[in-house]
Design a protein with these regions (language model features):
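Short, solvent-exposed beta-strand-terminating loops
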Residues: 85-100, 166-180
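Residue-level marker for buried hydrophobic side chains located in beta-strands
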Residues: 27-29, 58, 81, 169-171, ...
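Conserved beta-strand hairpin/beta-sheet module of binuclear metal-dependent hydrolase folds
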Residues: 1-47, 162-178
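Short glycine/proline- and charge-enriched loop/turn segments
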Residues: 48, 97-102, 183-194, 240
Length: 241
């Protein structure tokens, strides 16, 4: 679904990924679980494209629900995969999820359903990424859409948001989300539950990196889009802590 001009949203609840379209050229942002590949292919066809049209794959971070079918797309298209340097090693591994946080909260019905969807969509059959390129904070990636990298560690060491200044769009990954993966509740901008973050204190501090961006449409890794100033988004997120 095209949610903004040149930005297509793909979803298998509660997991989001996106395609940036620029002059007919496509960048895939995140890549769900392995089992979501067929959903992605069908979604591409619905907008008049094929998998071969993907020119680059960029990851907000190296968790299995964001890189699940990235290697399959890379092999099918020879499109390069890009990830922040601090998550580069993790991107070459399998089973990268905050397992302790998920399993310790599996008594919650929604978290249990998230685990069930992970297993049902091939989390244990993830093909590791065999070739990936590192980027650093502040880079402007030479891929369709020219996203700006904002390193915002805490959820993972290499967590980033991708900023598209000309479009007023921030693809926030799991820096800020709008759905609680513990309860399933929808809401405004929020930091993922503390048990899901590699460094929860850092995940909270890092929000200030986004404050000066101004008004954007924020596209999270989990939940619905949100529009407003990032200063307001940060205030809302901190009010939920």
């Amino acid at each position: 679904m095209e949610i903004l001009p040149g930005i297509h949203h793909f979803n298998t609840d509660p997991f989001n990924w996106y395609v940036i379209k620029a002059g007919g050229r496509l960048t895939l942002v995140d890549a769900g679980f392995p089992g979501h590949y067929s959903v992605f292919v069908e979604g591409l066809r619905s907008i008049g494209h094929e998998i071969k049209d993907i020119e680059a794959i960029i990851l907000t971070h190296a968790h299995a629900d964001h890189m699940g079918f990235a290697e399959r797309v890379r092999q099918a298209t020879n499109a390069p995969v890009f990830v922040h340097r601090a998550d580069l090693v993790a991107a070459g591994r399998v089973l990268q999820l905050p397992w302790w946080g998920l399993l310790s909260n599996a008594w919650r019905p929604f978290t249990a359903s998230v685990l069930g969807r992970a297993m049902g969509n091939g989390v244990f059959n993830l093909t590791r990424i065999t070739q990936a390129h590192a980027f650093d904070d502040g880079a402007v990636l030479d891929v369709p859409g020219k996203p700006h990298v904002l390193h915002a560690p805490g959820h993972t060491p290499g967590e980033v948001a991708f900023y598209l200044p000309e479009r007023g769009v921030l693809i926030s990954g799991d820096v800020l989300v709008t759905r609680n993966l513990m309860t399933g509740e929808w809401g405004g901008p929020q930091v993922p539950h503390r048990s899901l973050n590699s460094d929860d204190k850092q995940a909270r501090r890092t929000l200030d990196r986004l404050r000066e961006i101004g008004h954007v449409t924020m596209l999270p890794g989990h939940g619905r889009p949100w529009a407003g100033s990032m200063a307001d988004a940060i205030s809302l997120a901190r009010a939920t802590l």
